[in-house]
Structure formats: structure tokens, C-alpha cells
């Protein structure tokens, strides 16, 4: 009830787990079940965890070493102001060119069985890479036009770390699937997958259960940390310090 109250849009279906990687794997299964397709796209230098599926969506050499990627996992370049691939005449990032590349990549490098995108709102292990403000709104629009789903891995960026419950709120974007962790349990092993209302039944088809996920103690810890964030105005505090740091 608390999550449905504070999360944006129609994110109203929830399943609880005990690690970020497990939540990511569950989110990937939701994408497949909801879309009835299998391929997924992430970005170079993303990090989503260290189990087989999550590793296949990542680009960290130490995590991938000695492991074979799951077929159907693709990576594309991410807008990066430090090393942009495409820019406008004024030197700003040409987001439209990135989106056009994604469209061309899907057409020529996949088997046309793409479920959607799985991305970090702000890249963590890849170097704290912040996207241009128009990137996720345009990617959301592209996904809607092409019938693709958008999953935001907010394990690192969510739960107040950027001054919002979800980092995606900064751009007014509601993902179809969101993974939440780390600050969610404030050190306690509590994570969550949140999905938009049309996809809640996908939890049933993927047997979305976990031996320890959602146990009463973990849920109590997550609820308590959430209430502290609210009561002590920690969202506003993080946003204020973030603005100062970016200066």
C-alpha cells in the first residue's frame, strides 16, 4: 500500500526479493512474459548484477569473465557528455541520433524478438554517467511507438538517492518495470520489483516467489526506512545536496 501511494503513475504491482540481482532477474522475466518476446537491450558499461541473466545485460569485465552471455542480450551506446558519439553543431548531445541508432540496430542486429530496454537511469559502475534530460522521455516515446517495454534498474539510484523516490521521476518518465533495492532496506536485504498495472498478472505467469523475499522482517525494515525518509525530509535534503554537488 505504501509503495502504491508514493510511486509515480500506475506502478501498482509489487513482488519482494532479498537482493538486487534477484530483482533484476525477476524484472527480466516480467518483460518476457508481458511482451511474449525474448531479446533485451541494455547499454555498454551498464551493471545489473552477477547472476547469469543480469551479467548478460552488463558490461563489467570482471563480472563477465569466465561466463557465456545468455543469447539475445544486446548492448548499445549510451549518451555520455564526456565521450559523446553524436553531437549537434552547438556541441550538445544529439539524443535523436542515439534513438535512431537503436531503431536501426533492432532492425539489423536482432531477430525482431525484442521485449524491451533494461537500463540504469544513471550509470553507476560505468562512471556515474548522467543522461541528457531529453534521453529518457524520447526513449519512452520510442518504446511506446514500437511496442517495446522499458525497465529501469533503480537498485542503485532509487529510494531517495537523487532527491526523488525514483530517479526516473526527474524526467517525468514512468517505466513499465522498476527494480528497487539498496536504500530500500537501509542495509537490510530487501528489494522489490514494481510493475505498471497492465503487467501485474505477469507475476503469476513467472512464478514470482522467493524463499526469503518479502519476509515480515524485511518488509518491516523497508517500511521503516521509507517512513524515516519521509518524516525527516531526506528527499529534499538529497536533492539540495545534489544540486550543490553538481555546481
Label each residue range with its predicted role.
Residues 1-247:
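Conserved N-terminal phosphate-binding loop of PLP-dependent enzymes in the Aspartate aminotransferase
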Amino acid at each position: 500500500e505504501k509503495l502504491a501511494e508514493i510511486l509515480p503513475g500506475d506502478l501498482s504491482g509489487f513482488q519482494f526479493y532479498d537482493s538486487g540481482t534477484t530483482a533484476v532477474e525477476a524484472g527480466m522475466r516480467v518483460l518476457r512474459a508481458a511482451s511474449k518476446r525474448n531479446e533485451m537491450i541494455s547499454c555498454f558499461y551498464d551493471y545489473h548484477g552477477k547472476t547469469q541473466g543480469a551479467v548478460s545485460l552488463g558490461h563489467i569485465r570482471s563480472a563477465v569473465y569466465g561466463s557465456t552471455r545468455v543469447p539475445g542480450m544486446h548492448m548499445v551506446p549510451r549518451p555520455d557528455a564526456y565521450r559523446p558519439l553524436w553531437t549537434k553543431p552547438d556541441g550538445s548531445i544529439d539524443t535523436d541520433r542515439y534513438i535512431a541508432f537503436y531503431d536501426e540496430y533492432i532492425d539489423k542486429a536482432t531477430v525482431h524478438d525484442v521485449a524491451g530496454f533494461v537500463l540504469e537511469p544513471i550509470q553507476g559502475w560505468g562512471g556515474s554517467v548522467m543522461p541528457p534530460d531529453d534521453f529518457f522521455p524520447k526513449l519512452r516515446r520510442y518504446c511506446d511507438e514500437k511496442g517495446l517495454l522499458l525497465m529501469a534498474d533503480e537498485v542503485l539510484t532509487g529510494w531517495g538517492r537523487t532527491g526523488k523516490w525514483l530517479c526516473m521521476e526527474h524526467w517525468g518518465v514512468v517505466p513499465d518495470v522498476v527494480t528497487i533495492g539498496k536504500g530500500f532496506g537501509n542495509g537490510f536485504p530487501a528489494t522489490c520489483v514494481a510493475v505498471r498495472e497492465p503487467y501485474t498478472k505477469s507475476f503469476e505467469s513467472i512464478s514470482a516467489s522467493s524463499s526469503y523475499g518479502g519476509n515480515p522482517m524485511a518488509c518491516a525494515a523497508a517500511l521503516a526506512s521509507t517512513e524515516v525518509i519521509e518524516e525527516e525530509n531526506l528527499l529534499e535534503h538529497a536533492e539540495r545536496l545534489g544540486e550543490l554537488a553538481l555546481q
